[in-house]
């Protein structure tokens, strides 16, 4: 068990060094939505727990094993079970036959035990946090939830992603600011996030994010240019999927309650996005930036020089 925990710890430390942008995004998302807060439990918030377990394993091994047993009983049972399979239609009957013993074992394990669906109480509140490290660059992330602010997530946001990434952010953050790049994240839960990566700046990048709405209000493009943006966006939407990816995507949409009709509606909105549609996103983007949810993963010295921007300074891997 200790070896597995040490392996987990090493992988988490490596992830913080090599995927710092994902750490910043996950932390930011925990300020924005309940789903983000839940997912972040297994990200940076888990590291101090794993670190303490590996450092003090002998003192805590019995309590840890007892808790593992409790978790196992909650997980390995047939109550509330949903199973997804991606398979050729002709092979399904064989799969159903092969999976039956496992289902029976799970049913026996959970016999006479009631496992209730959990409604976790997770605080979601506006925060400004800096994650301090020895990194020589910053990963600056800012965002909010569109639905909470009364806005709809339409297909035009997918075109906006292309437009910002390769136009506005490219010029302001990469060319002028010297960062490796910047991107957006829009998901089906209504979460929207901007993030820069390998960025020598901090406050300057936040200013660029905050001025995005002004850029959108003055946005101009010819029909030919809009067609180019839409085609570029569709090339990412219609990416061929392996059977595994198809199955994962189907389960993700199922659990989120996203219907085929909703997906088609967004697709049509994307295909027919106009200059006016892009301009009309300005109030939503402005409202999201005014929420001032902020997470920066970066150099401790640079962060301390800008500490007035943050409520909380958190050392990572301290």
Task: Name each region found by the language model.
Residues 161, 170, 174, 206, ...:
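Generic hydrophobic alpha-helical scaffold/packing signal
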Residues 94-95, 151-153, 170-172, 181-184, ...:
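Extended hydrophobic-aromatic, low-complexity segments
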Residues 1, 152-163:
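Active/ligand-binding-proximal structured segments within catalytic/core domains
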């Amino acid at each position: 068990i200790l070896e597995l925990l040490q392996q987990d710890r090493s992988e988490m430390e490596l992830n913080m060094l090599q995927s710092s942008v994902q750490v910043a995004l996950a932390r930011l998302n925990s300020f924005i939505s309940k789903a983000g807060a839940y997912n972040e439990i297994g990200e940076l918030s888990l590291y101090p727990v794993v670190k303490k377990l590996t450092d003090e394993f002998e003192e805590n091994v019995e309590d840890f094993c007892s808790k593992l047993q409790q978790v196992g009983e909650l997980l390995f049972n047939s109550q509330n079970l949903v199973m997804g399979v991606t398979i050729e239609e002709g092979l399904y009957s064989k799969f159903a036959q092969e999976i039956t013993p496992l289902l029976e074992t799970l049913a026996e394990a959970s016999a006479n035990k009631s496992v209730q669906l959990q409604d976790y109480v997770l605080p979601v509140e506006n925060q400004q946090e800096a994650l301090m490290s020895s990194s020589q660059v910053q990963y600056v992330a800012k965002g909010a939830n569109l639905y909470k602010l009364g806005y709809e997530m339409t297909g035009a946001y997918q075109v906006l992603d292309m437009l910002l990434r390769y136009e506005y952010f490219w010029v302001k953050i990469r060319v002028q600011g010297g960062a490796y790049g910047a991107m957006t994240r829009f998901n089906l839960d209504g979460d929207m996030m901007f993030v820069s990566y390998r960025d020598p700046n901090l406050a300057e990048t936040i200013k660029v994010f905050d001025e995005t709405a002004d850029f959108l209000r003055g946005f101009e493009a010819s029909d030919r240019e809009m067609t180019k943006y839409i085609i570029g966006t569709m090339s990412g939407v219609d990416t061929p999927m392996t059977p595994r990816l198809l199955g994962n995507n189907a389960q993700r949409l199922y659990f989120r309650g996203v219907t085929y009709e909703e997906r088609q509606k967004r697709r049509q909105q994307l295909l027919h996005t106009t200059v006016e549609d892009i301009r009309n996103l300005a109030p939503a983007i402005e409202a999201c930036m005014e929420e001032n949810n902020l997470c920066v993963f970066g150099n401790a010295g640079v962060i301390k020089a800008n500490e007035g921007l943050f409520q909380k300074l958190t050392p990572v891997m301290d």
